[in-house]
Curated annotation (Swiss-Prot):
Pfam family, one: Tautomerase
Record note on quaternary structure: Homohexamer.
Keywords: Aromatic hydrocarbons catabolism, Isomerase, Plasmid
SUPFAM superfamilies: Tautomerase/MIF
Gene name of this polypeptide: xylH
GO biological processes: toluene catabolic process; xylene catabolic process
The species this protein was found in: Pseudomonas putida (Arthrobacter siderocapsulatus)
UniProt name for this protein: 2-hydroxymuconate tautomerase
Length: 63
């Protein structure tokens, strides 16, 4: 069972996350010739104050 773990900054809509899960699952299924029903996707959302970009908090870099 392939498992993809994706870390993203908070703020995406449920629709965007659903699209991400669907498209990642389809890509994994295709590339590994695995049944789509066996693919798992875990999304971990991070607060912008808990992630750094270029030495700065993401909350300061991305508004």
């Amino acid at each position: 069972m392939p498992i993809a773990q994706i870390h993203i900054l908070e703020g995406r809509s449920d629709e965007q996350k659903e699209t991400l899960i669907r498209e990642v699952s389809e890509a994994i299924s295709r590339s590994l010739d695995a049944p789509l029903t066996s693919v798992r996707v875990i999304i971990t959302e991070m607060a912008k104050g808990h992630f750094g970009i270029g030495g700065e908090l993401a909350s300061k870099v991305r508004r």
